[in-house]
Amino acid sequence: MSEQRGTIRRVFHWSWNQRHRFLQFGMVGVTGIALNQIVIWLCQEHLYTAIGDLSLRLNLAMATGILIGMTNNFHWNRKWTWKDRYRAEHTPLLKQYIQYCTANWAGILIQVALTNLLVLWMPYLVANLVGIGFASLANFTLNDLWTYRHVRTEGIDPEGAQLERARLALPLLLCGLVLSLCVYIVGLGSLHILSNGDELVYMQITRATAASGHWLPLASEDPAMVNTKPPLLFWQGILSTDWGTHWSLLALRWPSIVWTFATALMTGMLAWRLGGRDILRGVLAALFFLAFFSTFRYGRPFLTNPPETFWVFSCFSVMLWWSPGSFASRLAVPTVLGLLAGCALLTKSFAQLVPILAGLSLWHLSMRGWRWREFATRALPGLLWTSVLALGIFALWFAFDPKPAAIWRHFVVGENVGKMAGGIGSWFEGFLFSGDSVWTLALSWFLNAGLLAFPLFGVAVESWKHRREATREERLLWWWVLAIFLVFCIPAQRSGRYLLEAMPALAVLMALRWHHVGRNAFVLTHVGVLAVLVPIAWLSVTLAREIGIAWFSWWHWPFLAGAMAFAALSIAKPRWTAMCAAPAAMSVYLALTSFLAVFDAPGGAFDERTVAALKGKTLWVPENFRSVAELHRFLLPDTTIRGFASSLDAPPVKSTSVGEYYIVTEPLSSRAPEGAIGCRGQITSRHSPQQIWEMATGRISEHLFCREWIVPVSAPK
C-alpha cells in the first residue's frame, strides 16, 4: 500500500522543477493555439477556397490547424520543456511524435467527456474550461511519464528483467482472471451482447427443430437456411433448452461460455507446460485469450465458434502436450486426432479439415527437418487415417438424416462450394483489392486481439527478430498460425472469424514472450482502454440526459471512474503496466455490458400491460438482417412474430389483417404515434456513412438511440 501511495505521490506531488515545467508546457500550448487559429483562418479564407462544401472546407482547415499546432507543440516541448530528459534527444523522432500525438488525443477525449458530464450542473463555457484544465493535466502527465520519461526501458520492468518475480504479479493476474470469468457471465442473457447476425438464424433453426420433435432433419421457417450448418450446435441448443420448454437467451448461450472457458483452461495449461511449469505464464495465457476481442465477441453468443475453437485447438494441444512421442505415434494419436477433428467438422463444416491437416502436416515436416520422404513414410499414413476418421464422423449426418440430398444441395454446394464461386480473374481481384482481400485478413489478427493488438504486434516482431533462438514449440505454434492464414486466403469470402481457431496459439505465444516486448506496447493498450472508456462515459451521459439516470445500474458510474483510474495508474506504475493490460481490456468489456444493459428490462422491454395486450396476437417486426425478428420472441413469448423489410414503412397490406400490430421506430425525443399501445428503448445498428458522420459531429442521440412503438396495422404512422 505504501508503494502504491508513493507512486501516486510521485505523479501528482510535483516539485518546483515540475511546476516550472508545467508552466513551460502551458506557454508552448498557447503558441500552439495561436498557430492553430492562424492556420485555420488561412486555409478557410485562402488555401481551400476551391472546396465548395463549406462543412468539408472547415473540417479540412481544422484538421490542418490541429496537425500543425500539434507538431509545433511537439517540437518546442522536445527542445525546451523536457530538454533535460535523455529520451528527448535519443528516442527516434517518429516514434516520439506518435507517442506525443496519442497523449494529446487522450487529453482531447478527457476534455470532451468531462465537458459533457459537467454541463448537466454548470454553464457550458465553465464546464469547457474545467474540461480543458483536467485535459491539460492529463496531457502533461502522460507526456512526462511516457513520451519524455526519465529512463528508456526495453523490457517491461525498468528496474529489472525478471518482472514475473514481482510480489504482486501472480495475485494481480489471478484477480484479473476472476474478473474475466465474471465479465463473461454478466449480461449473458441480454438482448444486446456483442454478437453476430448468424446467432439469430441458429436460434430460429433450433426452435423450429425442437418444435418438430425430431433430431433430424433440421427445420427452419426459411427453407434456404435449413442446412446452413451441421447439427451439433442445434442439438446443443435443443438439450440446453429442454426441447424449447425453457426457451431463453441464457439457456441457449451458457454452453458457449463453457466451451470458451474450457479453451481458456486448455490454453493456460499448455502455456504452463511449455513455459517450464510456470503458473504465471499459464494464468497469463488464459487471461490473454479471454481478453481478446474476438473471444469476447464470438465466445459468448449461440454460435459455432466456441465449440469449433475448442475442438480444433484440442488437436494441436494433444500434439504439443505429448511431444515428441505424439509425432512418432502411428495409430493411437492419429485416432484421437480423428475423433477431435470429427467433432470440429460436425460443428462447423467438412472444410475445417483442410486447415487442421495443413497445420499438422507442417508440424510433422518441421519435426522431421523438412525431409519429405520421411514425412511420406512415417507421418502421412497417420494423417490419412485422421482424415478418414474425421470425415466418417461428419458423414454420420448424411447417414442419419432422412433428406441427404437437401444437405448436399444447401450445405455442400450452397454454403461451402459457393464461397469459391467466380472466375480466376474475379478471384485475383478480390484477393488483392476487395474488402475481403488478403490484406484485410492479415489485419484481422490484430483486430481479433482488440486492445491487445499492440502487445501481439510486439510479440510478432520480437519472435521474428529472435527466430533462431525460438524453442521448437514456439516454432510449431507459429507454423499453425501461418497454416490457417494461408488456407483461408483461398476462399473468395475471407473473414477474421476464420482465424479464431489460432487465437489460443497466439495467447500461448504472448504468455511465453511477453517479457521480451517493450513496455510501450502495453502502455498503448492502456491508452486504448482510456480511449474507449471515455466515449462510453460520454455516451452514458448523453443517454442519461435523454432518458434519466435511473435507467443505469447503480455501479455503472463508479465502475467507469474506477476503470479509467486503473488504466491511468497502470501507465504511471511501470511494474503494473504489462500485468494489468489484459484486466484493463476486460474492464472495457464490462463497462460496455453495463452500458448496453440499459436497453434490457425495464427500459428495453415492453411493460406487462403491452405484453398482455399482445398475447395471441400477430406482431410485424422490421428486419434489416435475416431473422432479426427472432429477438422479439424473447420479449413477447405469447405473440406470433413475423418480419418485414425494414426499408418499408409498414408491413405489406396484402399480408396483414385487422387486429395485427407492427413496430414503428422513432427517435427518443419523438411523440408517441397515434394508436400506440406500448414502447421500449433500443439502440440502433447498421448506420449509413452519413449517419456515422453526423454522430461523430455530435448528433449521437438522434441516430444511436430510438424507441420501438407498437401500433395497430390500421393506425396511421
Could you tell me what each predicted segment is?
Residues 202-208, 339-343, 347, 352-471, ...:
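Transmembrane-lumen/periplasm boundary regions of multi-pass, lipid-linked membrane glycan transferases
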Residues 12-14, 156-184, 272, 367-369, ...:
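Start-transfer (signal-anchor) and selected internal transmembrane alpha helices
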Residues 183-187, 201-225, 232, 239, ...:
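Extracytosolic helix-loop segments that constitute the early lumenal/periplasmic catalytic or substrate-binding loops
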